[in-house]
């Protein structure tokens, strides 16, 4: 079983916490992580691109000249694609880029990035993040006590609203509830700060 140091908010060590190897001791699978990140980034795309085809262009309902007898090429509409200001052929239309990967694949990807954080010594366990009021200054002090000064993902338990509010406007800090953890945010962070209760909720959901 893997164990990491458990810290208090003031930065002093409060013993060790044992991690479940079924969640934090998995051999990282880069291919699965790549697929999961690709899926998440695809679902983030707006997909609102659009062009006007000949039916969406204004005008063009009348045949510009008669079919025969003029010596000119036959035309049916001034909004045909070959005309200036005509419609676009096979242009992009609004669509969703999102797709789903199997649940087992997503779970393995999440376990892989969590396990990689442990291997990189980038996981910081805190016994709790308790604040009297949701003050950003107090949250920054805790991060300084933990020697965390890089891009950080903080995982808190579901009912810790004050911690979620205290750090939400820090530029290099993202705070998520334990149930909202995802592959992209974990992989994109340099440090992963997790409370004791959030660890328990993670292991309960993924083990």
From Swiss-Prot:
Keywords: Ribonucleoprotein, Ribosomal protein, RNA-binding, rRNA-binding. GO terms for biological process: translation. Coiled coil: none annotated. It comes from the Bacteria. Residues 45-78 are annotated as: Disordered. PANTHER family: 50S RIBOSOMAL PROTEIN L4, LARGE RIBOSOMAL SUBUNIT PROTEIN UL4M. NCBIfam families: rplD_bact (TIGR03953). This is Large ribosomal subunit protein uL4. It comes from Lactiplantibacillus plantarum (strain ATCC BAA-793 / NCIMB 8826 / WCFS1). The gene is rplD.
